[in-house]
């Protein structure tokens, strides 16, 4: 899926190349790893480069980027990666009727990934990462040795259902329809559980995939679920958020009434590398430059993309991705639009740098929060 990297992009107006700036720029609180020197977060630096070269904030203000259509995330072409020759070859890689245009868009998205990841200083391998970043990555990649695939799970992007599928494939569960409370650790193997040589072998030879979601919609889903339903999160995070950002909150708030703008203010002040996994940027969870994923599925096409992956890895025909429950009400584009339009514009502009690589790498348009759009 990732051909040879393109020639690095020229820095705007004679500026430093991306990788050199990564090595030189200070970060403040964020650190590369245990005892490592400070590093500038790639998302922050990438945002600064984009702003300097193309006036991104002005485009956000005018709603220009919001008019861009998201690029559908679809199967890779036939050009080989290691897994195809050394793991069971999934059948039916040819495009379905009517998918040719979608393949073109997928190719455009791949060029974006190659252009960003091909910059000097960007990681090419998990062992290029600082210790802390590599630890986070390896703890989020699940392993199926029986079906020879690796799945980087992203919270709030159907990861519980994928873990349920993996337990069925491992013979731990009889069916994906078993409605037991999901244990997110037991009977699952993570790359972090393996020795370095075992990790390298699987990264080279196994089919690798992840699923992504519109970044702010994912944040809204985490906000609604964790602060609206789960007492542990209300006590651990909600109470602290209220103390920090609400005037006259008192010393012991319950944390069960955090507003979305308060949550966004909290995210602005957090180091992305140390965030809770439910709102950590996908870039930091799955490191798509360090790991060359064969497929990136999307939440918007969840069931179709997931079942395509199961065909590719030759899962038994009776194992299908669970259908969404009738009672489930996910965060919708309409709900997201309402919450974003209710938040201060300046606050949104402060939040976007944390997630700009998730928008750009995975081809999601930036939100349109102009006055005109919010009045509709």
UniProtKB/Swiss-Prot annotation:
Keywords recorded for this protein, A-Z: Carbohydrate metabolism, Disease variant, Ehlers-Danlos syndrome, Glycoprotein, Golgi apparatus, Membrane, Signal-anchor, Transferase, Transmembrane, Transmembrane helix
Entry-listed glycosylation sites: 110, 368
Reported effect, residue 293 to C: In EDSMC1; results in altered intracellular processing; loss of activity
Positions that bind 3'-phosphoadenylyl sulfate: 155-161, 213-221
Segments passing through the bilayer: 40-60
Lumenal side: 61-376
Tissue specificity note: Widely expressed. Expressed at high level in pituitary gland, placenta, uterus and thyroid.
Topological category with respect to the lipid bilayer: Single-pass type II membrane protein
Catalysed reactions, as listed in the record: dermatan + n 3'-phosphoadenylyl sulfate = dermatan 4'-sulfate + n adenosine 3',5'-bisphosphate + n H(+)
InterPro entries registered for this protein in UniProt: Carb_sulfotrans_8-10, Sulfotransferase
Enzyme class: transferase
GO terms of biological process kind: carbohydrate biosynthetic process; dermatan sulfate proteoglycan biosynthetic process; dermatan sulfate proteoglycan metabolic process
Family, as annotated: Belongs to the sulfotransferase 2 family.
Function as written in the Swiss-Prot or TrEMBL entry: Catalyzes the transfer of sulfate to position 4 of the N-acetylgalactosamine (GalNAc) residue of dermatan sulfate. Plays a pivotal role in the formation of 4-0-sulfated IdoA blocks in dermatan sulfate. Transfers sulfate more efficiently to GalNAc residues in -IdoUA-GalNAc-IdoUA- than in -GlcUA-GalNAc-GlcUA-sequences. Has preference for partially desulfated dermatan sulfate.
Protein name: Carbohydrate sulfotransferase 14
Upper classification of the organism: Eukaryota, Metazoa, Chordata, Craniata, Vertebrata
């Amino acid at each position: 899926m990732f051909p040879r990297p393109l020639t690095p992009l020229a820095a705007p107006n004679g500026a430093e190349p991306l990788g050199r700036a990564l090595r030189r720029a200070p970060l403040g609180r964020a650190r590369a790893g245990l005892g490592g020197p400070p590093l500038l977060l790639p998302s922050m630096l990438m945002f600064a480069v984009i702003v300097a070269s193309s006036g991104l904030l002005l485009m956000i203000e005018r709603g220009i980027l919001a008019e861009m259509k998201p690029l559908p995330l679809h199967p890779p072409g036939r050009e080989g990666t290691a897994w195809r020759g050394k793991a069971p070859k999934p059948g039916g890689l040819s495009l379905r009727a009517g998918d040719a245009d979608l393949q073109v868009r997928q190719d455009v998205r791949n060029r974006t990934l190659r252009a960003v990841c091909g910059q000097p200083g960007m990681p090419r391998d998990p062992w290029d990462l600082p210790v802390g970043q590599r630890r986070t990555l390896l703890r989020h990649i699940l392993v199926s040795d029986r079906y020879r695939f690796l799945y980087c799970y992203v919270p709030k992007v159907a990861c519980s259902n994928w873990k349920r599928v993996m337990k069925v494939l491992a013979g731990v569960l009889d069916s994906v329809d078993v409605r037991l409370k999901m244990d997110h650790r037991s009977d699952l193997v993570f790359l972090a559980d393996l020795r370095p040589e075992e990790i390298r072998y699987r990264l080279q030879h196994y089919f690798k995939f992840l699923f992504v979601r519109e970044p702010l919609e994912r944040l809204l889903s985490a906000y609604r679920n964790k602060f609206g339903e789960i007492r542990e999160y209300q006590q651990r995070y909600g109470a602290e958020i209220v103390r920090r950002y609400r005037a006259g909150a008192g010393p012991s708030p319950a944390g069960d009434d955090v507003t979305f703008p308060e949550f966004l203010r909290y995210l602005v002040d957090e180091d992305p590398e140390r965030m809770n996994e439910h709102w950590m940027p996908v870039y930091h969870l799955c490191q798509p430059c360090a790991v060359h994923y064969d497929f990136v599925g999307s939440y918007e096409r969840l069931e179709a993309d997931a079942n395509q992956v199961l065909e590719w890895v030759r899962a038994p025909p009776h194992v299908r991705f669970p259908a969404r429950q009738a009672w489930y009400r996910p965060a919708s584009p309409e709900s997201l639009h309402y919450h974003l339009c209710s938040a201060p514009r300046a606050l949104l502009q402060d939040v976007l740098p944390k997630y700009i690589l998730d928008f750009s790498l995975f081809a999601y348009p930036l939100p349109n929060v102009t006055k005109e759009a919010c009045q509709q």
